[in-house]
Amino acid sequence: MSFKYDIPCVATTRSGAEVPLSLRAGKTFRDKAIGYMGARSIEKSCGTVYARGRSLHTLFMRIPVDVCWIGRFDPSNQSWPVVSLDASVAPWRILFAPRGAVGGIEIAPGTFTEPDRPLLIRRLD
């Protein structure tokens, strides 16, 4: 299964490190329902952004994912604030957004760790 990642981003972590990311938009109900079902892996530092939606699932997935819960997109600096991180979410889970989150980003597992989680994800395009 191959995905087209067409949103270049950079995540700024607590330590100040900048991690380059390649994201794709999950805009439709179908995008959200299917997601990474059946995928055998996700490329390092790649993921899908669901800008709206206070829940995500890993049903029928074969692999774990990291979930960055994001706040509202800020058009002035082209970024999403990261509200929290759920690392290595196992398959067959249903997740609900924490307070303050309006969406989520499913990303390759191990991209971030909790002590150095991202604070901000900024679009580069």
What are these language model-derived features?
Residues 1-125:
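Compact, glycine-rich, soluble single-domain proteins
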